[in-house]
Amino acid sequence: MYKRILVATDGSSKSAMATKSAIELAKAIGAEVIALNVINEVTVASAVSQLGSDRKDVEARLQAAGQKAVDGIKSMGDAAGVPVTTMVRQGAPAQMVVDVAAAEKADLIVMGSHGESGMSKLLIGSVVQKVLYWATVPVLVVR
């Protein structure tokens, strides 16, 4: 069975549902959880070019929001008695999820079916589609 479950969060309600499922599964089977938030490099570049924002300021704000999201997962894990490691990374979200899963030797990836932002609401989770295509381990998509 699974020993290391990677749960990817973007802070959306779908991610919260995926997190709940990952924690419950981990508790039931005695697995540990890796909580990952990816700062989308395209979001950073867009904020800098379109809004004239300072790159370091944008990155710091997104880092803080990402850390808050994974810290929430850590708290859920603590309450359930599930060990949780937290990570915030910057890059292309789908590729980063797959890369972190490989680097951390995750044997299951858990994700929400789509994010809450812009075009990802219109597409059935473009990040999820890419992860499903590229991942070398099972992927649980929570609706």
Regions found by a protein language model. Name each.
Residues K3-G52, D78-A80:
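Small/aliphatic-rich secondary-structure junction motif
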Residues A31-E32, V82, A106, V137:
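Short glycine/serine/threonine/alanine-rich loop segments
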Residues I34, T85, L140:
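Conserved beta-strand positions in the Rossmann-like core of class I SAM-dependent methyltransferases
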Residues Q50-D54, A103-K105, V127-V128:
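Short, hinge-like loop/turn segments at secondary-structure boundaries
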Residues S53-K68:
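A short acidic, glycine-rich active-site loop
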Residues K74-I109:
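Structural beta-alpha unit
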Residues L108-K130:
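Glycine-rich, Arg-bearing micro-motifs that act as flexible, cationic patches
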